[in-house]
């Protein structure tokens, strides 16, 4: 899921 991946990145780099 691309959504899950993007959510992980948004928490890594605000």
Swiss-Prot record:
Q: Which UniProt keywords apply?
A: Calcium, Disulfide bond, Hydrolase, Lipid degradation, Lipid metabolism, Neurotoxin, Presynaptic neurotoxin, Secreted, Toxin
Q: Which reaction does it catalyse?
A: a 1,2-diacyl-sn-glycero-3-phosphocholine + H2O = a 1-acyl-sn-glycero-3-phosphocholine + a fatty acid + H(+)
The subcellular location is: Secreted
Q: What is its EC number?
A: 3.1.1.4
Tell me the GO BP annotations in alphabetical order: lipid catabolic process
Q: Source organism's superkingdom?
A: Eukaryota
Protein known as: Basic phospholipase A2 T1-2 A chain
Species assigned in the record: Bungarus candidus (Malayan krait)
The main enzyme category here is hydrolase
The record's tissue-specificity note reads:
Expressed by the venom gland.
Cofactor annotation remark: Binds 1 Ca(2+) ion.
Similarity section: Belongs to the phospholipase A2 family. Group I subfamily.
Q: What is its biological role?
A: Snake venom phospholipase A2 (PLA2) that inhibits neuromuscular transmission by blocking acetylcholine release from the nerve termini and exhibits indirect hemolytic activity against human erythrocytes. PLA2 catalyzes the calcium-dependent hydrolysis of the 2-acyl groups in 3-sn-phosphoglycerides.
